[in-house]
Amino acid sequence: MRFLTVAFLFLALSASALAEPVKFKDCGSWVGVIKEVNVSPCPTQPCKLHRGQSYSVNVTFTSNTQSQSSKAVVHGIVMGIPVPFPIPESDGCKSGIRCPIEKDKTYNYVNKLPVKNEYPSIKVVVEWELTDDKNQRFFCWQIPIEVEA
């Protein structure tokens, strides 16, 4: 039993060590304040994302409004043009947030960023936003990434 407890603690600490806070650009968080953005694994920036893999994204933010729902939209910005970047779950209420969202409460939004095999090797800026039920942004952040083979 003691071994299982030690093993569990080791795994939990290892997983938390993989979550890398990244430097991000706020691109218009109108009704929220971003506290931290983590991409795992991303030990250096720009994040090097490998085709065929999926990356964990965790955003800690404080809401400045109430909302019954939330929706995530992700784009890759290539030469100034936003290109939709599909994610597994666009419903923020199914991504670590318990809805309804309350004013002045801090939330942890969690999702995956899958990098498809057919994506080209390219440098791109990822823009990730989460909106409320009035289409106002709880958060919007951007980070540079490099898609690699």
From Swiss-Prot:
GO terms for biological process: cholesterol efflux; cholesterol metabolic process; cholesterol transport; intracellular cholesterol transport. Keywords: Acetylation, Cholesterol metabolism, Disulfide bond, Endoplasmic reticulum, Glycoprotein, Lipid metabolism, Lipid transport, Lysosome, Secreted, Signal, Steroid metabolism, Sterol metabolism, Transport. One of its GO terms (cellular component) is extracellular region. InterPro entries: Ig_E-set, ML_dom, ML_Npc2-like, NPC2-like. CDD domains: Npc2_like (cd00916). Residues 1-19 form the signal peptide. It comes from the Eukaryota. The modification N6-acetyllysine is found at K116. One of its GO terms (molecular function) is cholesterol binding. Gene3D superfamilies: 2.60.40.770. It is found in: Secreted; Endoplasmic reticulum; Lysosome. Glycans are attached at N58. Disulfide bonds join C27-C140, C42-C47, C93-C99. Expressed in kidney, spleen, liver and mammary gland, but not in testis. The keyword Acetylation applies. It catalyses: cholesterol(in) = cholesterol(out). Interacts with NPC1 (via the second lumenal domain) in a cholestrol-dependent manner. Interacts with NUS1/NgBR, the interaction stabilizes NCP2 and regulates cholesterol trafficking. Interacts with DHDDS. Interacts with NEDD4L (via C2 domain). Interacts with NPC1L1. Binds cholesterol in a hydrophobic pocket; there are no hydrogen bonds between the sterol and the protein. Intracellular cholesterol transporter which acts in concert with NPC1 and plays an important role in the egress of cholesterol from the lysosomal compartment. Unesterified cholesterol that has been released from LDLs in the lumen of the late endosomes/lysosomes is transferred by NPC2 to the cholesterol-binding pocket in the N-terminal domain of NPC1. May bind and mobilize cholesterol that is associated with membranes. NPC2 binds cholesterol with a 1:1 stoichiometry. Can bind a variety of sterols, including lathosterol, desmosterol and the plant sterols stigmasterol and beta-sitosterol. Belongs to the NPC2 family. PANTHER family: NIEMANN PICK TYPE C2 PROTEIN NPC2-RELATED (PTHR11306), NPC INTRACELLULAR CHOLESTEROL TRANSPORTER 2 (PTHR11306:SF68). This is NPC intracellular cholesterol transporter 2. It comes from Bos taurus. The lineage of its organism: Eukaryota, Metazoa, Chordata, Craniata, Vertebrata.
